[in-house]
Structures are given as C-alpha cells and as structure tokens.
C-alpha cells in the first residue's frame, strides 16, 4: 500500500492493455463513463464488480459537465473553475460502493495548445488503473477536440490518496 501516490503522465497515449482490460473493454468502459450508449451485450461481456462496479461509474451528468468545461475554457482560457466533480453522497456509508467513487475530481487547464489536467482519486487498485487512465485520457481528448484551435491532450497530474495492488 502506498499513500499519496502522485505521478505526471503524458497523455499522448493512454491505452494500457492487460488481461483484465483488453482494448475493447477499455473503449467500452470509457464510452460508458463519457455518457455514450453501449449495448447490453457489451455490458454483459465486460462489466463486473471486480472491474470497478459502481465505484467506477462516473457518468452521472457527464455530457453537461463536458459542455461546461468546454464553455469555461473557451470563454476564460485561464480559468481555475474548469472542474468536473464526480457525484458523491454528502453522508456516505462506508459499506456502500455507490457512495465510494474512486475518482473524485478532475481540474482542467490550458497551457498553450495543450489541455492538461489534475485528477484526484480516493483510491486506486493498480490492476484497475488501465480502465481509469483510459477514461481520463478519453475525457481529456473529448474536451480538447471541442475547444477552438488545435488543442491536444497534454499532461495529467495523477494523485491517488491510496494505491493498492488489487481490489482484494
């Protein structure tokens, strides 16, 4: 177990394939968390409690959140308010996975033509990292593609309060 793990990650390639998360599973989970429609067959094939379950469900209101970030950075390129907060219960029960989202906030900022971000995770199991980094990369890419000019994904400052090997 590592407490307060942090790392800067270049986001020009955010695909980390593993046996648990082959490329298609990564794409399905990211699409789902971006609020896109996915088939029931894909849900059956790829979704499981071990792969993140409800702790990894970040999609609530995601379309509006993405639009808000794009509007914020378009009107105010140096804004400190380009933040996506993942919904959490204000009075969480420690026994509820729904109340314990792993990803808590992502702060976005422009540095020239690069869209950078800082992500705060409550917890990260190393074997689930490929799914989370793929989603964050897809989210940064989606926002960058909707900004004026040739904005590209830049650097992610990744912070996890606790890093463990697996979900056991």
Located regions from the model:
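Terminal, non-catalytic protein-protein interaction segments that mediate quaternary/complex assembly
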Residues: 1-168
